[in-house]
Amino acid sequence: MKYLLLIPDGMADWEVEELDGRTPLEVAETENMDFLAKEGACGIAKTVPDGFEPGSDVANLTILGVDVRKHYTGRGPIEALARGVKGKLVFRCNLVKVEDGVMVDYSGGRISDEEARKVIEELNRAKPYDFVKFYAGKSYRNLLVINKDFRDDVKTFPPHDITGKEIDKHLPSGGELAELLKELMGWSAEILPEITDKANMIWPWGGGRMPSFPNFGQRYGLRGAMITEVDLLEGIARGMGMEVVQVEGITGYIDTNYRGLVRETARALEEHDFVVLHTEGIDEVGHEGDAELKVRAIELYDSKIVGKLLNKVDLDETRILLLPDHPTPVKVKTHVAEPVPFTLYGRGRDEVKVYTEKSCRRGKFGLVDGLRLMDLLIKK
């Protein structure tokens, strides 16, 4: 038996007035996800434990069976695992645009990987402290490493949570480390405009010390592989001892290389027992707050990812679990911690006929703790 986990990041949503009171998932034409729901069994999953922010890090770790209450240290350190970066403290470091004290773009104008690398090189040339170092990632998603002993109880805010809001109310807080971060942010605001017109400030957040995750193969007795468009999931996979499969031409947006993602997923499924395909585009559109574009993004995912994979895998010998990690409602343009709809193909059927937030609530699994999902997928 093969196991395929499909995670369309941020797909779940709320009812939207401009969509006649329906969710983007309800409006979108999704015959392939509907097939999985009709031929499988459904439920809703709590992927964000109480007391945690609804980040993709927490939610995806939970889906993969990792108890974040024991193993989570921050988003930055997980992304560092993806790049082989080590340090005492690691922060995710966005390139952002701020105007008149307001966060207007958390993604640095979707800066290209190449331009972002040049920006990071210049930041390292001009950095004010030797114990500070920047590492380039993908597009606006970069890292800040601080190799000095600080208490790591600083409070930071994800920039995608404060789009359109004043940054003064959301700056780092919590002692000496917070003061350093604010100093670096102010310093970057002075030099970034000389380097690029896409971003005018760095925004460090999600920092912590390097984590230790349970080994996937040892725990489940399966050879696992991860295909993803973002460093975060690559870091989770590497931290769990899973193979990471690279795909050329991916963008983390709705213009991504769908064909390459499908090809490499199908190939990985031939060589491994368990494969995760995590895509980012739907979540990005949710952060933009565009309901119609989110409908389109979901339809692209259904036709170009799910539909193509259904034609490539042996459905008699493959179990498929499909769910977003968290909702990203277009109304609020950020993540929320509500349960997400899931469908599990290959473990019996229920009465659900379509894959939506509402229909999955009527599924036979009901409300499930996200930590149970892996057992539901792979148990005999």
Swiss-Prot record:
- What reaction does this catalyse? (2R)-2-phosphoglycerate = (2R)-3-phosphoglycerate
The reply to whether Isomerase figures as a keyword in the UniProt entry is yes
Entry keyword set: Glycolysis, Isomerase
Organism this protein belongs to? Archaeoglobus fulgidus (strain ATCC 49558 / DSM 4304 / JCM 9628 / NBRC 100126 / VC-16)
Which InterPro entries does this one have? Alkaline_phosphatase_core_sf, ApgAM_prokaryotes, Metalloenzyme, Pglycerate_mutase_ApgM
- Which terms does the UniProt entry file under GO BP? glycolytic process
Q: Which Gene3D superfamilies match?
A: Alkaline Phosphatase, subunit A (3.40.720.10)
Task: List the pathway annotation.
Answer: Carbohydrate degradation; glycolysis; pyruvate from D-glyceraldehyde 3-phosphate: step 3/5
- Transmembrane domains' residue ranges: none
Mitochondrion found in the keyword field? no
Reading the lineage from the top rank, the first entry is: Archaea
Q: Which EC number(s) are documented for this chain?
A: 5.4.2.12
PANTHER family reported in the protein's UniProt record: 2,3-BISPHOSPHOGLYCERATE-INDEPENDENT PHOSPHOGLYCERATE MUTASE (PTHR31209:SF4), COFACTOR-INDEPENDENT PHOSPHOGLYCERATE MUTASE (PTHR31209)
Query: What's one GO MF term for it?
Result: metal ion binding
Q: What does this protein do?
A: Catalyzes the interconversion of 2-phosphoglycerate and 3-phosphoglycerate.
As recorded in Swiss-Prot or TrEMBL, the protein's gene is named: apgM2
What name does this protein carry?
2,3-bisphosphoglycerate-independent phosphoglycerate mutase 2
Name the family the entry cites: Belongs to the BPG-independent phosphoglycerate mutase family. A-PGAM subfamily.
